[in-house]
Amino acid sequence: LKNLTLAKLKATSGQKSKMKSVQNKASKSKIIVLDPGHGGVDPGAIGRQGTYEKKIVLMAAKTIKKILVQTGRYEVVMTRKSDQFIALRKRVAIARRAQADLFISLHADSIKNGAVRGATVYTLSENASDKEAAQLAERENKADLISGIDLNAESQEVTDILIDLIQRETMNQSAVFAGAVVQELTTKIKTHRRPHKFAGFAVLKALDIPSILLEMGYLSNIEDENLLNTKSFQKKLAFALLQGLDQYFFKGQSFRN
């Protein structure tokens, strides 16, 4: 059954890929969703010098968007453009509605140890996501859960297998993109000693959209806090993401910007 289901998934995914390929050729750009974390009543972390995470990540998102869009290779959708609260599930829904090719959530960490600093890239862990996938399958309309693949007519067993296969591929692609971003970050800014980690963040749980969460630095570290407030640092982050995106989507090609 699993082999038959995999064959069916590949056939359906092939049709979806062809449709998306035509769309991409027409638009000549990849769709990136930038998700500035927190906002509104949720300030996120607060730095030792009073910096609000929700403000820093919004500033960074606007800088990143400008640099990505200027290349002509990327179309950028932001989950929020102002200081407003957006529920986690709605952030994922925005990405799915935009038919995003990649989802990037921006944050600035805070912990008790003020000596720890550097950027970290998170992707979804398999253990965390398996349980979440099952819960989503029960709660959500199956046709809405995985864009482009209608599971309404399928048995629960087939549905579970399809979701598992799609989720694993999405997680693999997320890890590939994370690796490209980490490679670029380490040449431009200070990164955590373990720059790629895995965790069960809710905003990373879109089954069909490769996603990363970028902790840009630690607001609990004064040096990081000062850097996060500067345009120059935000531009370094932006160019690291740009080059990571170029590596992921256009491997082997070289660009001037």
Question: Language-model features: where?
Answer:
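Active-site-adjacent mobile loop/cap segments within catalytic or ligand-binding domains
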Residues: 162-257
